[in-house]
Amino acid sequence: MAKEELLEMRGTVVELLPNAMFRVRLENDHEILGHTAGKMRKNRIRVLVGDEVLVELTPYDLTKGRITYRFMPGRGGPGGF
């Protein structure tokens, strides 16, 4: 089975929820539920309210996503974001 094409969008964390979940407002003003990716948990990368993040969404459920990158002020992002 081939891996489906993931959508990557930029957003801002607006709320911290239980069980390491976050409410993220995307650039297009939609709000989704997001969780941190495994590598972010492994490397103990903190995500706080107000952080700019990169979220992967599957085309099958556009209400949930995986936070894959936290943008740092003054630095570039992955892949030219």
Curated annotation (Swiss-Prot):
<protein>
    <recommendedName>
        <fullName>Translation initiation factor IF-1 1</fullName>
    </recommendedName>
</protein>
<keyword id="KW-0963">Cytoplasm</keyword>
<keyword id="KW-0699">rRNA-binding</keyword>
<comment type="subunit">
    <text>Component of the 30S ribosomal translation pre-initiation complex which assembles on the 30S ribosome in the order IF-2 and IF-3, IF-1 and N-formylmethionyl-tRNA(fMet); mRNA recruitment can occur at any time during PIC assembly.</text>
</comment>
<keyword id="KW-0648">Protein biosynthesis</keyword>
<comment type="function">
    <text>One of the essential components for the initiation of protein synthesis. Stabilizes the binding of IF-2 and IF-3 on the 30S subunit to which N-formylmethionyl-tRNA(fMet) subsequently binds. Helps modulate mRNA selection, yielding the 30S pre-initiation complex (PIC). Upon addition of the 50S ribosomal subunit IF-1, IF-2 and IF-3 are released leaving the mature 70S translation initiation complex.</text>
</comment>
<dbReference type="Pfam" id="PF01176">
    <property type="entry name" value="eIF-1a"/>
</dbReference>
<dbReference type="InterPro" id="IPR006196">
    <property type="entry name" value="RNA-binding_domain_S1_IF1"/>
</dbReference>
<feature type="domain" description="S1-like">
    <location>
        <begin position="1"/>
        <end position="72"/>
    </location>
</feature>
<dbReference type="GO" id="GO:0005829">
    <property type="term" value="C:cytosol"/>
</dbReference>
<keyword id="KW-0694">RNA-binding</keyword>
<comment type="similarity">
    <text>Belongs to the IF-1 family.</text>
</comment>
<dbReference type="GO" id="GO:0003743">
    <property type="term" value="F:translation initiation factor activity"/>
</dbReference>
<dbReference type="InterPro" id="IPR012340">
    <property type="entry name" value="NA-bd_OB-fold"/>
</dbReference>
<keyword id="KW-0396">Initiation factor</keyword>
<dbReference type="GO" id="GO:0019843">
    <property type="term" value="F:rRNA binding"/>
</dbReference>
<dbReference type="InterPro" id="IPR004368">
    <property type="entry name" value="TIF_IF1"/>
</dbReference>
<dbReference type="InterPro" id="IPR003029">
    <property type="entry name" value="S1_domain"/>
</dbReference>
<dbReference type="GO" id="GO:0043022">
    <property type="term" value="F:ribosome binding"/>
</dbReference>
